[in-house]
UniProtKB/Swiss-Prot annotation:
The protein's name in its UniProt record: Profilin
Subunit (UniProt): Occurs in many kinds of cells as a complex with monomeric actin in a 1:1 ratio.
Intracellular or extracellular location(s): Cytoplasm, Cytoskeleton
Species in which this protein is naturally found: Citrus sinensis (Sweet orange)
Lineage top rank: taxon: Eukaryota
GO cellular component, as recorded: cytoplasm; cytoskeleton
Amino acid sequence: MSWQAYVDDHLMCDIDGNRLTAAAILGQDGSVWSQSATFPAFRLEEIAAILKDFDQPGTLAPTGLFLGGTKYMVIQGEAGAVIRGKKGSGGIIVKKTNQALIIGIYDEPLTPGQCNMIVERLGDYLIEQGL
């Protein structure tokens, strides 16, 4: 299966008639493995800051998580595994695997719980596969 199929079929899937606003699978070097057409253009510094928070949990809390110039308030996540951010009625979930970052961006009516499920399910699968 191609990386694009993982994005199209597993991240941008329908959940009760709703779907993520944007999604991507990135290498931990910031390279794009695959992304939805709606995924924002980002700076490598933004990815570096996300990776730093995985290594040193809490570093993004004071400044917020930035992706594509959009600022998300960092909320409860799982240290070293998942970062969650909120902005208005939407937010972002970043799941770290052995080699990649799985990123999902959502807005209402999709709920934070639905976004968590979508992103973390794929991330857990990739971890099981050694990726």
